Amino acid sequence: MKKHGVLNSEIAAILAALGHTDTIVIADCGLPIPDSVKRIDLAVELGKPSFLDVLQVVIEDMAIEKVTVAEEITTNNREIYKEIETRLKEANFEYVLHEEFKEKTKQAKAIIRTGEATPYANIILHAGVIF
């Protein structure tokens, strides 16, 4: 049994398989998930697990060089946005309109659905390299 890092076997496998610039999404419970993208549904009830809880575990186990968020989060969900900025201060940030964000999710290797129920609590993580 694994002791540290991501314990969810599906998430651990996706992270291990990522190549440079591949993307994964951590999403609130309302983001539409394209049929063509692997869905890892962690939502057990409204608010659980939270977006920030899942984000923290993933960023501790993933090399990230860039993140993409919807512009709307900066004004409509400042609390989550400030936490994203703090936790990912080393990454480059890309801001797109929410509709474009949804289009970009079609290229992700997986979308991790949380129980988060606040607006625009979604992020695309772009894999970096560990060397």
From Swiss-Prot:
<dbReference type="GO" id="GO:0019303">
    <property type="term" value="P:D-ribose catabolic process"/>
</dbReference>
<dbReference type="InterPro" id="IPR023064">
    <property type="entry name" value="D-ribose_pyranase"/>
</dbReference>
<dbReference type="GO" id="GO:0005829">
    <property type="term" value="C:cytosol"/>
</dbReference>
<feature type="binding site">
    <location>
        <position position="28"/>
    </location>
    <ligand>
        <name>substrate</name>
    </ligand>
</feature>
<dbReference type="InterPro" id="IPR007721">
    <property type="entry name" value="RbsD_FucU"/>
</dbReference>
<keyword id="KW-0413">Isomerase</keyword>
<dbReference type="InterPro" id="IPR023750">
    <property type="entry name" value="RbsD-like_sf"/>
</dbReference>
<comment type="similarity">
    <text>Belongs to the RbsD / FucU family. RbsD subfamily.</text>
</comment>
<dbReference type="Pfam" id="PF05025">
    <property type="entry name" value="RbsD_FucU"/>
</dbReference>
<feature type="binding site">
    <location>
        <begin position="120"/>
        <end position="122"/>
    </location>
    <ligand>
        <name>substrate</name>
    </ligand>
</feature>
<feature type="binding site">
    <location>
        <position position="98"/>
    </location>
    <ligand>
        <name>substrate</name>
    </ligand>
</feature>
<comment type="pathway">
    <text>Carbohydrate metabolism; D-ribose degradation; D-ribose 5-phosphate from beta-D-ribopyranose: step 1/2.</text>
</comment>
<comment type="function">
    <text>Catalyzes the interconversion of beta-pyran and beta-furan forms of D-ribose.</text>
</comment>
<keyword id="KW-0963">Cytoplasm</keyword>
<comment type="subunit">
    <text>Homodecamer.</text>
</comment>
<dbReference type="GO" id="GO:0048029">
    <property type="term" value="F:monosaccharide binding"/>
</dbReference>
<keyword id="KW-0119">Carbohydrate metabolism</keyword>
<dbReference type="GO" id="GO:0062193">
    <property type="term" value="F:D-ribose pyranase activity"/>
</dbReference>
<feature type="active site" description="Proton donor">
    <location>
        <position position="20"/>
    </location>
</feature>
<dbReference type="GO" id="GO:0016872">
    <property type="term" value="F:intramolecular lyase activity"/>
</dbReference>
<protein>
    <recommendedName>
        <fullName>D-ribose pyranase</fullName>
        <ecNumber>5.4.99.62</ecNumber>
    </recommendedName>
</protein>
